[in-house]
């Protein structure tokens, strides 16, 4: 299965991926809102 190192790497990667996804979503929504005005 997984050892502690693999689990830590996966958790770290998942956290970074979610953070980037939220930032990208925020920038896209902000751009759409500004273009609407």
Swiss-Prot record:
What start and end residues bound the annotated signal peptide? none
The record's GO CC annotations read: endoplasmic reticulum membrane
Q: Which InterPro entries match?
A: Oligosaccaryltransferase, OST4_plant, Ost4p_sf
Q: Which UniProt keywords apply?
A: Endoplasmic reticulum, Membrane, Signal-anchor, Transmembrane, Transmembrane helix
Give the top-rank taxon of the lineage listed in the UniProt record for this protein: Eukaryota
- State whether it acts alone or in a complex, and with which partners, per the record: Component of the oligosaccharyltransferase (OST) complex.
Q: What is this protein called?
A: Dolichyl-diphosphooligosaccharide--protein glycosyltransferase subunit 4B
Lineage, top ranks: Eukaryota, Viridiplantae, Streptophyta, Embryophyta, Tracheophyta
Gene of this entry: OST4B
């Amino acid at each position: 299965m997984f050892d502690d190192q693999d689990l830590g790497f996966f958790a770290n990667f998942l956290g970074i991926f979610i953070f980037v996804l939220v930032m990208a979503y925020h920038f896209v929504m902000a751009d759409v809102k500004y273009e609407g005005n």
